Amino acid sequence: MLGKKESEISMLHKVKIPLIIVVVSSISLWVGSSFFSYFTHADPPEVVLRGIEKDGCYAGMINCAIKSDNGYKISEISVFLDNKELELRSSKKVGARKFEIPFRLDTLNLANGEHSIDIESADASYHRNKSKEKWNFYVDNIPLKAAVLYPEYKVDQGRTVHVRVQSNKRLDKAQIKFLENLYDCYPESDFSNVYECFIPIDCELAANEYMMTADIQDCVQNSVKLASKITVNSVTFPKQRGFTVAKEKLEEEKEVSMNNRILEEALEKWIKDYPKKKLWAGNFENPIEIKRVATPYGEIRTTTEKGRYLHRAVDIINHPKSVVWTSQNGKVIIKDRFLMTGNTVAVDHGLGVVTLYCHLEDFADIEVGDYIKKGNPIGRLGMTGYANGYHLHWELRVNNVAVDPFEWTKKTF
């Protein structure tokens, strides 16, 4: 019996000793690791602010939280609103690696406009690594007011409606709806509260009265809906007997030109990504000195190759190979040769406005992507493509609808 008891004690000692060794080793490893981490940790604390986005806009009460899931425990945090320290629960002595400190911010106690929150933090390591983060944000507790500057617009077929919306503050969204099409409005200039867009009236749109609506929304989601009337006046467009282009010329063009479908696809792509501001200033200029207008905008044509159609551009004539220049500041988005339009240059002027210069003899020293100024040469007057004489086919599109370009030379949009 005694021998059995001694055997059990011996067995217990055999188990206990390794267990003690494991425990002591684990503690030593943990202490060593903590000791090592304490002296070597060098990463600055990572602290985030929930509830407020940088450069966001807010009204009323904001539920916020300071959160961290850091590599080393945070010893303290200081929070400043517009350089004045906020007294927050547990913000001074945190003592944890992972934590969340909720707080509420009542913007009604703040002035409308720009504010900032700064968060300074330090960890508990030997180096007391520190970080400082800044969140700029805006307060807007002003009731939204907006109006369309003209309650009614009267416009001819083939012309452009310049819509302007006046607001009492900066807007997040100003969108016009006309004939199921949506047009985004943008500030007339930096810091302006007048938002504008351009609505093209197709030359074949029936003369009638139409309603236009505006969806206006500020940066804190207040919204108003506005309405205005657009009266489209009928225009009697002239008729042309038509013309022919020699088959031999068309066959030659096919050898060196791309299909015009490629041009249309490229324009659709570019117009979706147009610059959200005007690149132009003042009136547009005629791209050549005009000796004669061979074909006015909207003329009804009948040709063998294209059948009956409306000419949605102007054909203007000067001496063969005369210099052609851009009618306004903009960015070259297309420079290529196409079957119908020949050597073609397209210039993006921003806000969905594009001009095209077609049938050029050749190109000036320009490349796609170049920003060019009004009056810069883009090529020479030619008769490439579907043309039977020297002329410039000048086209102006608004949101990819061709309108009368001469209107843009007479009015400041």
Model-identified regions with their sequence ranges:
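Low-complexity, Pro/Ser/Thr- and charge-rich linker/hinge segments at domain boundaries
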Residues: 39, 49-51, 138-157, 229-258
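Zn2+-dependent peptidoglycan hydrolase active-site motif and core
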Residues: 312, 326-362, 390, 395
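Long, low-complexity serine/threonine/glycine- and acidic-rich segments characteristic of extracellular
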Residues: 37-40, 44-139, 177, 181-210, ...
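Conserved, short, structured surface segments that act as functional micro-motifs
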Residues: 344-349, 353, 370-413
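N-terminal Lys/Arg-rich, disordered targeting/topogenic segments
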Residues: 1-14
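Surface-exposed, glycine-biased beta-strand/turn segments
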Residues: 226-341
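Cationic-aromatic interfacial patches
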Residues: 138-229, 234
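Short, well-structured beta-strand-loop connectors
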Residues: 323-334, 365-381
